[in-house]
Amino acid sequence: LGDVYKRQVLAAVVALGASLAGCGSSGEETTQRYSWPLATASPEDTVTQIFAEKFAEEISELSDGRMKIQVYANSTLGGDRDLLETCADGDIPFVVQNTAPQVSFMGDLAVFDLPCVFDSLDECREKIDNPEFYELISNVYTEGGYHLLGMADQGFRVMSTNKPVYSFSDFKGQKIRTMENSYHLAFWKAIGANPTPMSFSEVYIGLQQHTIDAQENPYEVIVSNNLYEQQDYVVETNHLPHLISLIVNDDFFRDLPEDEQEIMTEAAKIATEYAREQSDARIADKIATIEESGTKILTLDDQTRAEIRKASKSVYASIEENIDPVIYNAYMDGIE
């Protein structure tokens, strides 16, 4: 029933968008109004949603209300995979989502699964914004049928656990829930942990019943799902950035007048910076919530991070073998 309902909603949204696209006086182009759907699979109180809403707001502002975007959150129009497919088909022009589910559609995006590349979020953002690298990644999206408008983030993914991690050896044997991603599994195995893929809906109970010791996610997810209530420690492994892409169907974008393309590009730029600022503020707030609960936050020293990188060499080699070497080298350029 859920899938049938979503298909009905999608059909209604597409029909509405088509009807609104023609609204306005035929003799007055400035009064023409558009209403295009933008979909996410994320809850409303997330950076993903903030990113989407800010983009829609700026589109309206920069076009003097002529261009309109309606945001649909909470998987209203489908889950991550559904949204990618319907965006590629052109039924939903815009999608905002994490890059992780996109790897199965665009293999070169596995570059973002390279572990422990960056020492800080600023370094990561500088890399994403590097014109040469951004163009390479944009081309990956174009080949997939999308146009990349912007890439924000939700900070780094960190580890929460009931077993403290003070040194590299403390990862050994920890039963940690991971996403169903071969590179993620390989990383945790490489550093001595015992990774266990599990549906996210089962994680809280798994921690509560001690079928797993640990899990990994951005701070926002750890707090919004109350996972910290079942954990004694949060370890700032910062092993992967949690990147959020804003994409549009490529044919749809190319068919727009040049001035509207420019409005979208500028709106996305503003929304990306805003989402990053909001993410930073929200992470600080989430950390305070965790600390107030009595859960301790642990940071890793340089030696431990160096040992993690050394142990992860096999993961680097595997990803390097499976993606465009130009993209791999551009991502790793300047990384010691």
Which residues does each PLM region occupy?
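Sec-dependent N-terminal signal peptides
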Residues: 9-15
